[in-house]
């Protein structure tokens, strides 16, 4: 028995850091080391000219002499998460209850770059909500009832590209081949002029701009799970001593809704420039692409119902003979939400008897 309810509230915050952060060299160091790596006796070919190295060191026009730390451009070295929990319990000899509500929010290590270029934020964002409600009632001296209602919600938003692939691209792109983007005034088009370069290791004829790949598009996923259970325990001593009936009914419904919004992007390379006037021209790689977001989505889920009844007789005669008889019946039904074929629309059913 509790004179008054017991209430608990807990709020936590956490900072996560990367276990190991790669140290990236700057552009001039990269070019010098690259020239040294490919040089050999009798060959004085240098992929990067001294003029480009000197211009990068001097910090001249960053579109002609880019010096991009792609990892630092995309990733934060730490991320913050928070969680909160509220619960209350109480009751008396006739009834007791427990209720709990939990909330959790976490972000990834990506920087929120997409909102600098578009109207959406595609950074990793996870929200989790959990609700638990349990109620136990002693209706009579021989009758006990239990009811449980639970709800779990997971709401996730993330870039269209997997974070591992984004990390790999940031490791592949070198700091001096192209800038993140070119100035908007170099074209009369209203889309972002992403930097790029002809060639590449992906077999497409060009390199892949890590920032452009990251910020273009996003996906969302909402998952909900609802469970409910009802239990009845009835002693049947009025019929015969030691006889007891227990009934259980449970229900679970799971649903998932996913949406993907994707778009192409237009990328350019510096086709020519004049070192004396610092004027340059850019050329689009491939055909012009539509930057309008396209939408694709899917829904799925399932539900399950379960019923169980137990009739149990347990009695000791004259403190010597122990008699125990049990009869059990159960049945289960499983359905798919939104079936797409005749076969998948048919419920799966099971029945069982034991004694």
Can you annotate each of these PLM segments?
Residues 24-30, 114-121, 162-171, 261-271, ...:
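Flexible, surface-exposed loop regions and adjacent strand-edge segments
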Residues 1-225, 231-237:
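Membrane-proximal, glycine/serine-rich, low-complexity loop/turn segments characteristic
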Residues 16, 106-108, 154-156, 254-256, ...:
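Sequence/structural signature of outer-membrane beta-barrel proteins
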Residues 14, 130-132, 227-231, 248, ...:
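One-face residue pattern on beta-strands with alternating periodicity enriched for small/polar residues
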Residues 66-91, 180-189, 263-355:
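Outer-membrane beta-barrel transmembrane domain signature of Gram-negative proteins
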Residues 9, 244-253, 324-331:
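Extended hydrophobic secondary-structure segments that form protein cores and membrane-embedded regions
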Residues 109, 132, 139, 242-252, ...:
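Transmembrane beta-barrel domains of bacterial outer-membrane proteins
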Residues 16-20, 36, 102, 257-267, ...:
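Short, solvent-exposed beta-strand-terminating loops
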């Amino acid at each position: 028995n509790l004179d008054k309810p017991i209430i608990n509230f807990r709020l936590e915050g956490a900072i996560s850091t990367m276990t190991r952060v790669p140290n990236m060299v700057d552009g001039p160091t990269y070019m010098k080391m690259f020239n040294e790596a490919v040089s050999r006796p009798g060959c004085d070919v240098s992929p990067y000219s001294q003029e480009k190295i000197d211009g990068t060191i001097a910090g001249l026009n960053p579109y002609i002499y880019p010096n991009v730390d792609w990892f630092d451009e995309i990733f934060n070295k730490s991320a913050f998460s928070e969680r909160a929990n509220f619960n209350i319990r109480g009751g008396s000899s006739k009834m007791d209850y427990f209720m709990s509500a939990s909330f959790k929010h976490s972000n990834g290590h990506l920087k929120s770059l997409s909102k600098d270029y578009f109207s959406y934020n595609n950074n990793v964002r996870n929200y989790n909500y959990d609700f638990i409600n349990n109620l136990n009632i002693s209706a009579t001296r021989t009758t006990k009832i239990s009811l449980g209602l639970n709800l779990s919600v997971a709401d996730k938003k993330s870039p269209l590209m997997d974070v591992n692939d984004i990390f790999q691209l940031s490791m592949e792109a070198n700091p001096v081949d192209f800038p993140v983007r070119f100035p908007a005034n170099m074209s009369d088009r209203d889309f972002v002029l992403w930097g790029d370069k002809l060639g590449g290791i992906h077999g497409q004829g060009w390199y892949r701009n890590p920032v452009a790949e990251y910020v273009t598009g996003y996906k969302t996923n909402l998952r909900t799970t609802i469970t409910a259970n009802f239990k009845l325990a009835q002693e049947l001593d009025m019929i015969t001593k030691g006889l007891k009936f227990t009934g259980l009914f449970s229900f679970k419904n799971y649903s998932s809704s996913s949406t993907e919004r994707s778009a192409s992007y237009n990328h350019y390379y510096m086709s020519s420039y004049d070192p004396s006037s610092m004027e340059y021209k850019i050329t689009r790689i491939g055909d012009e692409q539509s930057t309008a977001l396209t939408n694709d989505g899917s829904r799925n889920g399932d539900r399950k119902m379960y019923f169980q009844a137990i009739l149990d007789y347990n009695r000791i005669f004259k403190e010597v003979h122990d008699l125990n008889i049990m009869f059990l019946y159960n049945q289960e039904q499983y359905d798919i939400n939104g079936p797409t074929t005749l076969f998948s629309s048919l419920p799966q059913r099971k029945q069982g008897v034991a004694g």
